[in-house]
Amino acid sequence: MARSHGERLKTRHKFNKDLRARGLSPVSKAVQEFEVGQKVHIDIDPSVHKGMPYRRFQGLTGEILGQAGRAWFVGISDGGKKKTVIARSQHLKPQKNSA
């Protein structure tokens, strides 16, 4: 049988939740708002399939560039090249201030 090359290929451990975090996400993650220029971490929530960024961007930190509907544009640097990732707010976590 031919091997599949789907979006979630090689994500068996990367998209695992710890035992206490299993199940659906809280609604507060779905309705969180960001400001343009705010720093966010891409933290993919595997229980929400809509608006999920590609697995390569898991764990990266970027800057909010704008919004389109329920999704956010996040500017990241991938190997020195600027890229724009489109993700819903369930897959984004605001960066805490280092002050």
Curated annotation (Swiss-Prot):
The keyword Oxidoreductase appears for this protein: no
GO molecular function, one term: structural constituent of ribosome
Pfam families in the record: Ribosomal_L21e (PF01157)
InterPro entries: Ribosomal_eL21, Ribosomal_eL21_arc, Ribosomal_eL21_CS, Ribosomal_eL21_sf, Translation_prot_SH3-like_sf
Keyword terms of this UniProt record: Ribonucleoprotein, Ribosomal protein
Any one GO cellular component localisation term in the record: ribosome
Family that this chain belongs to: Belongs to the eukaryotic ribosomal protein eL21 family.
Originating gene: rpl21e
Annotated GO biological process: translation
Protein name: Large ribosomal subunit protein eL21
